């Protein structure tokens, strides 16, 4: 089914200023710790099973960076949320990393981990697994030290604005690489808004630069504490089409089907996609 033919998910707002405002309002009830428990603690956060969703995401990222083609000086993580796992393999390839999120509570959660404050979420199992699959002999402590040292700033972002980081951003632009995990589909009222958000973040990337995009397939809602948040359902083909429309060559697109034992009632996700895309141009 093409984007033009897709019927909006039940409860989804129309693609309009009011629709985007409704999304922003719903996110004011977002609870970072509940989100982390739902998705990054067991069972979904169990990294002992190599067929689990966590190992799959980490392998996709590690294998892509291992090609040596995705490198440079600057990287921007779009819509980081309260998570850092998406940068564990990236941090050895980029010396200047910018993390971003729309919500202050998520930026605060990231700050606690970056400053090693008591009570910060423990990502050590993810760091250990990333070191294991990279096979460089690096300790997880060294991995985390490097990531903390290379994250230079945590900034507000609004992917629905033509200038997502605003004017006069301290982030070096354009970036050599963008990473984004579970952001665009989770904050877009419909596919048209998803496409525009992708267009907007693409302005932050240099021609020839790379985008690594992770997201939910065919998901319409998820829970984060008291918040029940609407998601625009996307298919693998719709992701591919959106990337091409935004001026990318799709280098790799993989999918993971969520097994029954990981369908825990915190969302209705059917699977996960990982896309590696390169912005056309020199």
Swiss-Prot record:
Query: Do you know which CDD domains this protein is assigned to?
Result: AdoMet_MTases (cd02440)
Q: Per its UniProt entry, which superkingdom is the organism in?
A: Eukaryota
Keywords (alphabetical) are:
Catecholamine biosynthesis, Methyltransferase, Phosphoprotein, S-adenosyl-L-methionine, Transferase
Activity regulation reads:
Inhibited by p-chloromercuribenaoate.
Which tissues and organs express this gene's product? Expressed in the adrenal medulla.
**UniProt key word S-adenosyl-L-methionine:** yes
Checking PROSITE patterns in the record gives:
NNMT_PNMT_TEMT, SAM_MT_NNMT_PNMT_TEMT
Q: In which pathway does it act?
A: Catecholamine biosynthesis; (R)-adrenaline biosynthesis; (R)-adrenaline from (R)-noradrenaline: step 1/1
InterPro entries, per this entry?
A: NNMT/PNMT/TEMT_CS (IPR025820), NNMT_TEMT_trans (IPR000940), SAM-dep_methyltransferase (IPR053384), SAM-dependent_MTases_sf (IPR029063)
Which Pfam families has this protein been placed in? NNMT_PNMT_TEMT
Per its record, the protein catalyses: phenylethanolamine + S-adenosyl-L-methionine = N-methylphenylethanolamine + S-adenosyl-L-homocysteine + H(+); (R)-noradrenaline + S-adenosyl-L-methionine = (R)-adrenaline + S-adenosyl-L-homocysteine + H(+); (R)-normetanephrine + S-adenosyl-L-methionine = (R)-metanephrine + S-adenosyl-L-homocysteine + H(+); (R)-octopamine + S-adenosyl-L-methionine = (R)-synephrine + S-adenosyl-L-homocysteine + H(+)
Q: Where is the signal peptide, in residue numbers?
A: none
- Which residues make up the binding site for octopamine? 219, 267
**Binding-site positions, S-adenosyl-L-methionine:** 35, 40, 79-80, 85, 101, 106, 158-159, 181
Keyword Acetylation belongs to the record? no
List its EC numbers: 2.1.1.28
Instruction: Name one cellular component (GO) term.
Output: cytosol
Q: What class of enzyme is it?
A: transferase
Q: Which family does it belong to?
A: Belongs to the class I-like SAM-binding methyltransferase superfamily. NNMT/PNMT/TEMT family.
- PANTHER family from the entry? NNMT/PNMT/TEMT FAMILY MEMBER, PHENYLETHANOLAMINE N-METHYLTRANSFERASE
**Under which name does UniProt file this protein?**
Phenylethanolamine N-methyltransferase
* Gene name of this polypeptide: PNMT
């Amino acid at each position: 089914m093409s984007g033009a033919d897709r019927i909006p998910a039940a409860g989804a707002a129309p693609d309009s200023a009011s629709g985007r405002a409704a999304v922003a309002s719903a996110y004011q009830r977002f609870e970072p710790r509940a989100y982390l428990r739902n998705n990054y603690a067991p069972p979904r956060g169990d990294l002992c099973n190599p067929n689990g969703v966590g190992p799959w995401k980490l392998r996709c990222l590690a294998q892509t960076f291992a090609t040596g083609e995705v490198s440079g000086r600057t990287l921007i993580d779009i819509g980081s949320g309260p998570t850092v796992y998406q940068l564990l393999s990236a941090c050895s390839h980029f010396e200047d990393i910018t993390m971003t999120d729309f919500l202050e509570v998520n930026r605060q959660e990231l700050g606690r981990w970056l400053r090693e404050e008591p009570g910060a979420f423990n990502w050590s199992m993810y760091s250990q697994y990333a070191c294991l699959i990279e096979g460089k002999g690096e300790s997880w402590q060294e991995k985390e030290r490097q990531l903390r040292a290379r994250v230079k700033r945590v900034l507000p972002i609004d992917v629905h604005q033509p200038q997502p980081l605003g004017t006069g951003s301290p982030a070096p632009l354009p970036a050599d690489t963008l990473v984004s995990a579970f952001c665009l589909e989770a904050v877009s009222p419909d596919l048209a808004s998803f496409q525009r958000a992708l267009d907007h973040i693409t302005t932050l990337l240099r021609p020839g630069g790379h985008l690594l995009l992770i997201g939910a397939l065919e998901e319409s809602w998820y829970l984060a504490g008291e918040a029940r948040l609407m998601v625009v359902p996307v298919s693998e083909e719709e992701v591919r089409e959106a990337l091409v429309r935004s001026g990318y060559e799709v280098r790799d697109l993989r999918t993971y089907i969520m097994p029954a034992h990981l369908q825990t009632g915190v969302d209705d996700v059917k699977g996960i996609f990982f896309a590696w895309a390169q912005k056309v141009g020199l």
